[in-house]
């Protein structure tokens, strides 16, 4: 079942342990079971969504350029969706993973913050392979959360 335009939603709350990652994980499963194509964006440096799909050991071995952190790194200006987005064992669900490297970019210096604020929106905008984009946010309102709110506001 295809949706006319991609729907982007971020699950955000300034409190940890309130179920953002669990809700994102289970909502993705339910939507995939009904035939929707999902992209889960793990915007939390804890990488809970990434660990749920790929395991802790694998997630710890990802380089910054294999995770959401690559969008914020000046050295990765030509990074592609094929490099960042990973398929999972569940049909219809793909993940843009995160790990500890994302913490470096969650609270950038003031001169970098302006350049970084549209990175995720600009990355997601041309993607047409997904019906729904779910973004799991960290328990704060720093850079990763602001980035997560922009794609939903533009749809």
Regions found by a protein language model. Name each.
Residues 1-155:
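P-loop NTP-binding core
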């Amino acid at each position: 079942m295809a949706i006319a335009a991609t729907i982007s939603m971020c699950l955000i709350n300034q409190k940890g342990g309130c179920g953002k990652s669990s809700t994102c994980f289970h909502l993705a499963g339910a939507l995939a079971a009904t035939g929707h194509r999902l992209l889960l964006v793990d915007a939390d440096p804890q990488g809970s969504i990434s660990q749920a799909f790929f395991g802790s050991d694998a997630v710890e071995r990802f380089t910054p350029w294999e995770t959401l952190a690559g969008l914020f790194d000046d050295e990765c200006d030509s990074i592609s969706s094929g490099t960042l987005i990973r398929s999972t064992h569940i049909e219809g669900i793909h993940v843009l993973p995160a790990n500890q490297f994302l913490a470096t970019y969650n609270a950038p210096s003031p001169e970098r913050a302006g350049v970084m604020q549209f990175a995720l929106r600009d990355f997601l905008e041309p993607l047409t392979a997904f019906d729904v984009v779910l973004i799991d946010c960290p328990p704060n309102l720093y850079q990763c959360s602001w980035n997560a709110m922009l794609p939903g506001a533009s749809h």
